[in-house]
Amino acid sequence: MMMRGMNMQSMMKQMQKLQKNMKKDQDELNATVFEGHAADDAVVVKFTGDHKMTDISIKEEAIDPDDVDMLQDLVLMAVNDAMSKIDKQTQETMGKYSRNIPGL
């Protein structure tokens, strides 16, 4: 009976440690800045790991009033590039927590 209580207490401590580590990793990921680029850096965007855009840079030569569609495409390419990097890093960082848990 005493042994079972010790195992449960040990398991709870391990879960608390795991939860603390997950939060730390998530906080670090959220604070990381990811850049997305399009067409030789004609458009560069910056996002934090929690998907908040912090900056966008558009080179003057990418701005053509007669071709707004091109600029829109470049912005989309840069944003999608950044999102892809965030997703990849999130999977690498947080995936370790769900690999050995059934059902996740």
From Swiss-Prot:
Residues 1-24 are annotated as: Disordered. It is found in: Cytoplasm, Nucleoid. Its main location: cytoplasm. The keyword DNA-binding applies. PANTHER family: NUCLEOID-ASSOCIATED PROTEIN YBAB. Binds to DNA and alters its conformation. May be involved in regulation of gene expression, nucleoid organization and DNA protection. SUPFAM superfamilies: YbaB-like. This is Nucleoid-associated protein LSL_1227. Keywords: Cytoplasm, DNA-binding. Homodimer. Residues 1-19 have a biased composition (Low complexity). The lineage of its organism: Bacteria, Bacillati, Bacillota, Bacilli, Lactobacillales. One of its GO terms (cellular component) is bacterial nucleoid. Belongs to the YbaB/EbfC family. GO terms for molecular function: DNA binding. InterPro entries: YbaB-like_sf, YbaB/EbfC.
